Structure formats: C-alpha cells, structure tokens
Amino acid sequence: MLSLRSLLPHLGLFLCLALHLSPSLSASDNGSCVVLDNIYTSDILEISTMANVSGGDVTYTVTVPVNDSVSAVILKAVKEDDSPVGTWSGTYEKCNDSSVYYNLTSQSQSVFQTNWTVPTSEDVTKVNLQVLIVVNRTASKSSVKMEQVQPSASTPIPESSETSQTINTTPTVNTAKTTAKDTANTTAVTTANTTANTTAVTTAKTTAKSLAIRTLGSPLAGALHILLVFLISKLLF
C-alpha cells in the first residue's frame, strides 16, 4: 500500500502531461512535417488558381495570400480515394500524408505562389486541393474546387485568304506574260522593218553604182568620150 501511495504523484504528473500533449498530437494531421496545436477551417482565405495548358499537361498556378506572420503553407492534392495526384514546383518538404510543406520563415511577401501540374486527361473536378496557412502552431485550412480546362483547338486558316492570294497573283502573271509577248513582237517587227529598209537602201546604192560603172565601161561611152575630147581640142586651137 505504501508503495502504491508513493507512485500516485508520479502517475498524476504523467496523466497531466498526456492530457496536455493530446490536443497537439490529434491536431497534427499533416504527416510529421510540423506539429500543429489547432487547425481551423476557413472559407475566406481568398485562394485563387489559374490554369495554363501546355502540350499534354495543364499547370495550375496556386496563389495564397500571406503576411509576415505566416511561417509555412501546406498543400495537398488528392483524389476521391485519397491518393495523391499531380506534381508541385519549388522547394518544399514532402510529408508522410502526401502533402507538401513550404517554409516561409525567411521570406517576406504578400502572396505565395506555386505550380501544380497534372495531365490534361485528369478529371480535376474530382480532386480535393487542400491549403493550410500556418501561423506559429495554428493553421487555417481551406479546400479549393478545381475547374476542368480543355486544350483549345488550333485555329484553321480561313479559305478567303487563299482565294484572295490566287486572285491577286494570277493577273500579275498574265500581265507579265502579255507584256513580254508584246515587247518581243514589237522588237521583232522593228528589227524586221529596220533590216528591210537597210537592205533596200543598200541595194539601191549598189545598183546605181553598178549602173554607172557599167555605163562608163561600155563602147558607146568610149566613143562619146573621144568625141568630147575632139570637140574641146577644136575649140581651143
């Protein structure tokens, strides 16, 4: 009995410590990244997401408002069966429950941003995105509903552009061909006329010269020449 009485103070102290530590152990559901005393659910955290489709993936930029008192942001994206989905960017610590822990103690900013990437085939409307904003050992928790984003189809080239190009190009080719043809014809006609005129003049000159030579070289021309010399000599003497 005396030994039991001596153990009672120690048992009471142990029970007090267990009761004191139990709230923090039950509240810390983020997988040993950090111990939280209290977690409050809030719908006024003004968390926003913006999607950007690239190739076969869609990247959501998650923006969380913070201040100098915020020491960390914890993010978690899980499917309906509580399995994790997607990949996160930046420097973080991965917790045991598939959440990611971003330490902000050395940063001073008004917003925290990170990227979450999933395949375009993933139905993100069934994904539960949880955000915890940690101040000291107290966290405000909020869930964000994601919107499905489909990749936009490429814009086809309007047919009117191709038609316009054909209409504008064809007259130019025809005009060029017509101009070249007319120029060739004009050059040919001019060359022919010039050649004909030159040939005619040359032929006429050659004919007259030949006629004069033939006239002077005939017997009648010689007789006339002798008679002319005889008459001139009579007049002089």
UniProtKB/Swiss-Prot annotation:
Disulfide bond residue pairs: none
Its biological purpose is as follows: Modulates leading keratinocyte migration and cellular adhesion to matrix proteins during a wound-healing response and promotes wound repair. May play a role during trichilemmal differentiation of the hair follicle.
Q: How far does the signal peptide extend, from start to end residue?
A: 1-27
Keywords carried by this UniProt record: Cell membrane, Differentiation, Glycoprotein, GPI-anchor, Lipoprotein, Membrane, Signal
Region entry Disordered, spans: 145-170
Q: Which residues are glycosylated?
A: N30, N67, N103, N136
* Major localisation: membrane
Task: List where in the cell it is found.
Answer: Apical cell membrane
Induction profile: Up-regulated during calcium-induced terminal differentiation of outer root sheath (ORS) keratinocytes.
Which positions correspond to the propeptide? 219-237
* Signal keyword on record: yes
This chain belongs to which protein, by name?
Answer: Placenta-expressed transcript 1 protein
Q: Which GO terms describe its biological process?
A: cell differentiation; negative regulation of cell-matrix adhesion; positive regulation of cell migration; wound healing, spreading of epidermal cells
- Which residue numbers carry lipidation of type GPI-anchor amidated serine? S218
Q: Which gene encodes it?
A: Plet1
- Name the organs or tissues of expression: Present in hair follicle cells and sebaceous gland of skin, ciliated epithelial cells of trachea and bronchial tube, striated portion of submandibular gland, distal convoluted tubule cells of kidney, ciliated epithelial cells of oviduct, medulla of adrenal gland and anterior lobe of pituitary gland. Expressed in keratinocytes of the hair follicle at the trichilemmal zone corresponding to the terminally differentiated outermost suprabasal outer root sheath (ORS), including that of the sebaceous gland duct (SGD) and the directly adjacent upper distal end of the companion layer (CL).
Membrane topology annotation: Lipid-anchor; GPI-anchor
Q: How is it modified after translation?
A: N-glycosylated. GPI-anchored.
Which ranges are annotated Polar residues under compositional bias?
145-162
Question: Which Gene Ontology cellular component terms are annotated?
Answer: apical plasma membrane; external side of plasma membrane
